[in-house]
């Protein structure tokens, strides 16, 4: 995001890491790693957000990239650390390291290889952009010899430059409007896809006469 670079890049580059708080002081971690939840072969409203769903340049999660699901009972009872909430930052810890996205919506699960960072005393959108900026530093925590992996206990010690509250609030206000617009566009596109999928077979079968549709 150009706004982030324009507003903070110079200050971040000049900041002394000795005076910066650690990431772990600024977030609560939602961590359900350790074992795999019972999955369903059906597509439910409760997707597992894995590493594949965090790849790409977009800021928000595209749930079309989720391929695993749990049922309602598992969603409500299995996940010991809870579920992501809006504006949490989801980050991968195994495989393709430090892939990250912002969680928006109401249903989604994190289990193996992904944790959620919930900002408590910092703008979540500032923190997201900051983590994107230092992604190479996070990847450098890799301890895996066969499969790349990073420990959460390592990355939470990474220093984070925190600007004045007034600057954070000004950035958050603009960034949240832009991000909400992206999410609205995503939801509108999903609605149009569902409408297309519902109408196209009826058009092809002749059940609906295209000549009577006012387009």
How would you name each of these model-derived features?
Residues 50-51, 68-135, 139-146, 151-153:
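A short beta-sheet element
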Residues 52-55, 94, 154, 164, ...:
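Short, small-residue-rich loop/turn micro-motifs
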Residues 140, 211-212:
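Short, hydrophobic secondary-structure boundary micro-motifs
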